[in-house]
């Protein structure tokens, strides 16, 4: 039998139906003093390991990976780099909840406040006694309101461009039925919107790619405020209500004065799971904030908090054997 090149210790969880795979042992050392440096080291030297962890036959296109790292910031419990089948994520709300619950499962943390260091900043997470987890996300804001894009298959579509840890194009008027039974059509429509944004050179701030498309509609459940469908990088859809997407939505609601600070927002995802969101204005927290590029955030920047549940599904070892033709995954 061929020897193993790598053995990765992992814990799989799901948050509102969306899976997270936390890699906590066996990964090669990454070069760099900061987590941003380590992200570059990951990208440049070990992208084949991202593919091996995420892609079939060991993973799937829905899975989000979370590489656990020692923190470089003294305030942080751990560092984490999120990634998926398409590449790397600055931040992942459902993934953060999954990581916190997985660490609790390992008895490495208990109920209380914990900080995770991500490439886009420190993220505050609170593990509650009932097992739920609240994530105080990175500063979030609306960049542009009601941007028009012509989608050949759909006509004129308007949406807000907002940052919630990733870049989103948020669309409320789209004529689609947001139901789990309609996922194929929703995926096609959101991919068409994404392609139209690229063709029109419509981007986030500093020409950043808008890699998430989010559709909203009213829900059949009168206990929730909205239902969404989120297309993620790699063309998979988010089973959860999407933590960074809900943060981006809260930023737009705040900018339009449609949601007051600390007022609760119940965001339902396409499979029916719910995140509870709220926010405070960054200025009210007396915080001097700079984005990862070192520039000041806009005046109406918010600090969102997202609360949800995650559940551990598996604890195992991923093995990459030397003679395995698919040790680096099956290209998607």
From Swiss-Prot:
Molecular-function annotations in GO: 4-hydroxyproline epimerase activity
Active site, renumbered: 92, 242
Record-linked InterPro entries: Pro_racemase_fam (IPR008794)
Entry-linked Pfam families: Pro_racemase (PF05544)
Annotated coiled-coil segments of the chain: none
Keyword Zinc-finger: no
Keywords in alphabetical order: Isomerase
Gene3D superfamilies assigned: Diaminopimelate Epimerase, Chain A, domain 1 (3.10.310.10)
Binding site for substrate: 93-94, 212, 238, 243-244
EC number(s) recorded for this UniProt protein: 5.1.1.8
Enzymatic reactions: trans-4-hydroxy-L-proline = cis-4-hydroxy-D-proline
Family note: Belongs to the proline racemase family.
Role summary: Catalyzes the epimerization of trans-4-hydroxy-L-proline (t4LHyp) to cis-4-hydroxy-D-proline (c4DHyp). Is likely involved in a degradation pathway that converts t4LHyp to alpha-ketoglutarate. Displays no proline racemase activity.
UniProt name for this protein: 4-hydroxyproline 2-epimerase
Originating organism: Psychrobacter cryohalolentis (strain ATCC BAA-1226 / DSM 17306 / VKM B-2378 / K5)
């Amino acid at each position: 039998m061929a020897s193993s090149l790598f053995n990765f210790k992992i814990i799989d969880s799901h948050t509102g139906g969306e899976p997270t795979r936390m890699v906590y042992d066996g990964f090669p050392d990454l070069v760099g003093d900061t987590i941003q440096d380590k992200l570059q080291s990951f990208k440049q030297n070990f992208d084949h390991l991202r593919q091996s962890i995420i892609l079939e036959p060991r993973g799937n296109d829905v899975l989000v990976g979370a590489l656990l790292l020692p923190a470089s910031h003294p305030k942080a419990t751990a560092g984490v780099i999120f990634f998926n089948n398409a590449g790397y994520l600055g931040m992942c709300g459902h993934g953060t909840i999954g990581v916190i619950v997985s660490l609790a499962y390992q008895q490495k943390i208990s109920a209380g406040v914990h900080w995770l260091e991500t490439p886009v900043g420190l993220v505050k997470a609170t593990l509650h006694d009932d097992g739920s987890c609240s994530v105080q996300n990175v500063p979030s804001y609306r960049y542009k309101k009601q941007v028009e894009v012509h989608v050949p298959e759909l006509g004129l579509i308007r949406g807000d461009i907002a940052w919630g840890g990733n870049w989103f194009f948020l669309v409320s008027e789209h004529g689609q039925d947001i139901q789990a039974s309609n996922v194929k059509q929703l995926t096609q429509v959101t991919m068409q919107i994404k392609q139209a944004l690229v063709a029109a050179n419509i981007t986030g701030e500093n020409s950043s790619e808008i890699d998430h498309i989010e559709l909203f509609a009213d829900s059949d459940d009168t206990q929730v405020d909205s239902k969404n469908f989120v297309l993620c990088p790699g063309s998979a859809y988010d089973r959860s209500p999407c933590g960074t997407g809900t943060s981006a939505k809260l930023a737009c609601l705040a900018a339009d004065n449609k949601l007051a600070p600390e007022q609760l927002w119940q965001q339902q995802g396409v499979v029916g799971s719910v995140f509870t969101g709220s926010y405070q204005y960054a200025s009210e927290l007396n915080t001097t904030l700079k984005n990862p590029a070192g520039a000041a955030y806009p005046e109406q920047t918010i600090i969102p908090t997202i609360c949800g549940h995650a559940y551990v599904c598996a604890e195992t070892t991923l093995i990459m054997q030397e003679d395995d033709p698919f040790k680096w995954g099956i290209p998607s």
